[in-house]
Amino acid sequence: MGKRVVIALGGNALGNNLPEQMIAVKQTARAIVDLIEEGHEVIIAHGNGPQVGMINIAMTTLSREDHSHPIAPMSVCTAMSQGYIGIDLQNAIKYELYKRNMDVKVSTILSQVEVDPEDEAFKNPTKPIGRKSEAK
């Protein structure tokens, strides 16, 4: 068995919309399966900044237009983005494995992060989510 390889994919590397993400995960899956084919155990972690931002904007817009839908908390938007990024990666990897006649299990796992609301980092955020906008 080869080495365990951990791959970190930034959310920006996955595109700025769903069609771009589908292209990115297909290309990424080929490289990942190359590593698996070489005998490595592969673990993938991914970012979700642009994706969670798009979901947050969509959910906020829905809430403004239909008050029966409350604004989704960031934890829910994060889980939604992890789920759809994860399933797209999982499906692309599984398809690439299938094309190569390789029987390897692939799983998506959602994660949770606990933060201290009093953390000094909240005073000067450095990690944006969603679209960038110019100050007016």
Go through each PLM region and give its residues:
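N-terminal glycine-/serine-/threonine-rich phosphate-binding loop
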Residues: M1-N48, M54-R64, P73, C77
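Ligand-binding beta-strand-loop-alpha-helix segment within the catalytic cores
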Residues: L62-K136
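Generic domain-boundary/flexible-linker signal
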Residues: G53-M54, D119
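An acidic- and aromatic-residue-enriched active-site/binding cleft used to recognize and process polar
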Residues: N48-G49, V113
